[in-house]
Amino acid sequence: MRKALNSNLLLVLLLCGYAGAQEFKGHVKLLNNLFVPYPDTLVWFTDQTLENRLEVKWDVAPWLRLEAQARNRFIYGDFVENIPNYSSLIGSSNGFVDLSFLWAEGRSFVGHTEFDRLFARVSYSRFELTLGRQRVNWGIDLVWNPNDIFNTFSYLNLEYPERPGTDAVTLKAYTGSLSYIEAVYQPNKTADSSAYGVRYRANIARTDFQVLVARMAGYYVLGGGLSSELGQFAIRSEVSYFNAQKSSEKSVLVATLSADRSMGSNSFVQLGALYNSFGSRGSHEPLSLIEPRAQSPMMLSRGKVNLFAGVNSTVATLFIPSLAILVNPADWSAAVIPSLSYSASDNLTLALTGMLFAGNRTDEYPNIGQLAYFKVQWNF
């Protein structure tokens, strides 16, 4: 009860605070999902999600900014009705403070609110201190981010571009116009499960690079990344080595390399590869489509190697067809994601997206069925 009251109070403050805010924006989105399971293709599942996102920023003083962002979802349909404990799959919070709550739940529907940003940022001279639920973005690559140890996410979570936040204290010190040192502490229930790290980022000879040292639950981390240009291609790479603290655990190396290029003003092409020494072949955990997430930067893939290819283009300034493919070359399973979006106006978008799987039951991308959804999104 106390959790619900506190969360409702936060939501009321968010809704009422926009009047004095320097920036207030968000979106309303309707998703209509269709899932055809395999091998039982006779029973089709449908559900609908109505989502509202609110983002409020206040510049209280020249040195103080407050920011709050929340997403509110009402989900109803066959998934909720037929999947046991559905609400627990979307209602869990990965922060030190639980800022998510269920405000409606029935046999075939669930209502959920989550604050994924709620922080204060203090700036003084070359220093910047951020406290609260925030996005700690240490990633460089556009698909997989082994450097992003505080906010791990899954590429398959297509309808969450804002990405999750985490409860942390971040101190950033600018050492130049294009360089800074950043220290992060992410508390958890115990000291051993807490995480902390330091990153240095700079730009030399038109190359952005970073090095980091950190500790996360059970592992010490040493990593780095870069973003540069090679001819007409942008090259991005990240590598992280996770040194296990216990001899019974295995140390892990995760690395990515990608290249992307804009083809004129209308097309974008991207190729990428991921190596994960922790990966294996066969007997993978079941793939979840409800709330895809990577549990840690060591679990960005289930196999040792993943390949990625993606392309999108703009047709007649209004239509944007795109195609993304994730492949495990060890078992040749694949996730194929075609999409077509239409810009009806400056703030109204319609999109049709599919998520198709080709693989055996124990492969990384097993053919558990095919998913398609239609989206209508209004931004304000």
Predicted regions and their residues:
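Transmembrane beta-barrel strands of outer-membrane/channel proteins
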Residues: 28-34, 68-72, 131-133, 183-187, ...
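Outer-membrane beta-barrel "beta-signal"
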Residues: 309-311, 342, 348-349, 353-356, ...
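Outer-membrane beta-barrel architecture
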Residues: 53-55, 118-121, 170-172, 199-201, ...
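Repeated loop/turn-to-beta-strand initiation elements of outer-membrane beta-barrel proteins
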Residues: 24, 62-66, 126-129, 178-181, ...
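Residues that define the transmembrane beta-barrel architecture of outer-membrane proteins
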Residues: 44-50, 111-116, 123-125, 163-167, ...
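Outer membrane beta-barrel
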Residues: 64-180, 359
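Detector for outer-membrane/organellar transmembrane beta-barrel domains
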Residues: 229-324
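Surface-exposed strand-loop-strand hairpins of Gram-negative outer-membrane beta-barrel proteins
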Residues: 33-49
